[in-house]
Amino acid sequence: MAHYPGYTVLRTEDCPEQHGTLTLLTHDVSGAAVLLVENEDVNKAFGIGFGTFPSDDTGVFHILEHSVLAGSEKYPVSSPFVQLLKSSMASFLNAMTFPDKTVYPFATPNETDFCNLMDVYLNAVFRPLAMVDSAVFEQEGWHRDADGTVSGVVYNEMQGALASPDAQLQNALQRAMFPDTAYGFVSGGDPASIPALTYEKYQRVYRRHYSADNCCITLYGKMDMADKLARLDKDYLSKMPKAAARPRLTLQDEQPGAFVELPYYTDQPKPDEVQCALAWYTGAFADRERQLGVEILLGALLNTNSSPLKAALLAEQLGADIDIGFDDSTLQPTLELLLRGATVDSARKFAPAVRKAVDKLLETGIPHDLLLAALNEAEFASLERPGSLPDGVLDAINAATGWLHTGDAALLLHTDQLFAALRSKLEEGWFDTLLRELFTPAPVQVLQIPTAPKAEDAAAPVRTDGKLVLEHPLTAADLGAGDAAPQGSAEPLAGATLLRHPSAGSLYLNFYYDLGGIAPEELQYLNLLTDVLDELDTPAHTAQQLNTLRSTWLGDSRAQLDLWTGRQEGAPCHAKLTLCLSLLERSLEKAVEIGGEWLYDTVLTGAAAEAAYARVVSQLKLRMEQLFIQQGNEFASTRARAHYYVEGAADEACTGVSYYHFLCSLLEKADWAALGVKLDAVRRRVLQNAALTVSLHGTEAALEKLRTLLPQSRFAAAQRTPAQPYTQPLTPPVNEAFIIDGGVNYDVLAWPMPRDSRRRVLARVMSYEYLWHTIREVGGAYGTGMLCADGIEFLYTYRDPHLRESYDAFADAPAALAARDYTARDLDEFIVGTAAKLDTPRKARAAARELDHRYFCGITDEMRAADRKALCSVDAALLKAQAAALSDVLSGGVRVAFGSKDAVEAAKDLFDRVETL
């Protein structure tokens, strides 16, 4: 067993799930818990998590999360976190407030960067200037402006976060389930309560919770662990003796049968937009076998519209959709069923309907094949670890969670034995017993009713503005040359092009049908087809049976539209109908068989299909309405892009406001038979005639097997139409505002711009030198930035209390950047931070898709090298010239905003048209 001076090693163990070794330690002086995850992952990660348990709705821990990153003893600058964002090579850099903990993680492939970041993070959390500077508290938490209005970054963020009916319902549900513990409070802060937080209480809470003996530190990846532990000990932990007894969470007496009726204030209350949430406790956090069993059980019974419990509940026609929620990261895990699109009368019938459906399932028994499929799917996800978070960041969060609730930071990093144990229980009736135990108690219930609002419901430190001084700052020389893409091969086979890139581990098999010959109005129907496929039968299987087969044999399977444009001037748009499959190599034959049946044989006409269309289209409309409130900046950006290039227009038609209008039109017509005929005709034309590229990311053995399977599959065709560019007419730019519920705004200004990789440096300067200060720190928006896409650039704000003021700030940006002086160190920071994003490590599935994207768009390693070279050539003169030239460009840009009724009406002169969504 290794020895580390200053630490006591508790245990060391192999961990196949992490492809390495785990070591748990305690720091002798401070009592800090430390977990080492040693493996060969070069995307090294660090995380420090504190147990933080709110006692009110002031959001004190959320404000602290923001505040500690705003300057520290060693780094006494206004915004060290922002300076790291613009100059670091990190693949992940953030902080997160959870209901019971606050975690500060990062990941980076660069050793020097890792040491810099670790020191900045540790100095921030243990020695923040915010404890002696109330200005940070006022900026990040709350303050009153000259006119008496309350503002602040967290205050404004939470106004947006709590604007949606979903967020308000969830908070009410937590209060009903946990009336006496920390989980009953809004950890992010309720705007109604945030102004009650004083600076003195904020300081007291920090001192009690941000101590070394109330933290868990994780070091992950390929690194010199002894060196990192020595730094931790010497610079921080050895100087922090154990405090008094650390704060602890308490268990809540369960509240079966608790009922809350909650109004949701909206200017346009509709009687069929009532929501009803039912929730149950699922047992002890430490019983990881049981909690994984709950996850698998919910997947088997509720994952799709055809899953037995969800299908039975939808058949009662109580509402438009039913969502599930399961949180097993808290001391008392919970599950939730949420009925959407209901009336008051139907919502009151939801709990009895659930009881009835569960009882019926218990009478017949849960089908074994459903449980096996859900278990396989969960196990594949555990192995693949999909999503964008680096593995080390996930481990740091999980380590903090396990340590917090059980004292064992390694608890959540071991899963193999859990899956093995549950697999052995499939035949024992264990899951039936679990189902009975979960749903026997009366649920906690929250009924949310849209309601028109009533009138009364309307709503000295040592610091410098200088640069962050690191011991070993990164320069352009640290960038390296970038990794070359794996060399692929292409060959004709069975009427298709077979593309293969070598890879080990999971297989990724993607089928791309060219849509170059599709009319623009048909693209929306194809997109809808990808949304409804899960709900449709085939001649051989019901939708439920086919979904079970997919989960049993495939790790992931989805149909989607892909829209890609090359980098060259005037490059065409490549539109594809795509079937994406991820699997283990032993399942390749089944994958081809199941994928072919799912895509080709689903029955698109008839009574069953028509019922599915009515159900799914209604669900999609509801989900888009929720997303307008939560992610308005994305919809605004999509709308703006539609005016300038074909890919943007096609994307907006399939994911933006135009698609929402399309769904509303279908619901209004309710001619589901005609819809089925249309979908069938469009699908037949594409699958039978369109050029097909089959992309395999896998071994040579898998390629040989696929060469045998493909000619005998549904994907084979004697002849296909050659691929061609997708075209669509563009509409003239229009300044538009869309009114949404909620008290925040999402403002976008976009303009066309020929691709030039050097402009990405300008975007980074704009984001972190001007917008961050003007829009976020002064204006109080939660997020802001400048983005460069191929052919278009735009400025945006996110959860912004302002609308007109932000557009004014956009207009002032060019002059502010052009007047700024740029030192050699400034340029190094901007260039390093920008160029590093070209090489952000990707997980296997994302890496496979990126290689396919490069193939279709003709992107070569030489092009990427040229981008890197161009970035590194940016100098001060170019930056100032680019900034100055922006003034004329911005004045001709298009404005698109999603915002509150009051904000939009106060700035309606900025827009050519206004629409209420």
What is each PLM-predicted segment?
Residues 1-45:
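Non-catalytic terminal extensions that flank enzyme cores
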Residues 144-212, 218-221, 225-233, 240-265, ...:
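Hydrophobic, small-residue-rich alpha-helical packing segments that form membrane-like cores
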Residues 37-40, 47-49, 155, 159, ...:
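His/Glu-based metal-binding/catalytic segments typifying zinc-dependent metallopeptidases
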Residues 92, 203-207, 264-266, 309, ...:
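Generic recognition of flexible, low-complexity loop/linker segments
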Residues 43-53, 79-127, 134-140, 167-192, ...:
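M16 family metallopeptidases and their MPP-like homologs
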Residues 200-235, 651, 655-656, 675-710, ...:
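Non-catalytic, conformational "gating/processing" segments within enzyme and secreted inhibitor domains
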Residues 58-70, 523, 527-531:
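Active-site recognition of the HExxH zinc-binding catalytic motif
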Residues 427-454:
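Extended, domain-scale alpha-helical bundle/helix-rich regions
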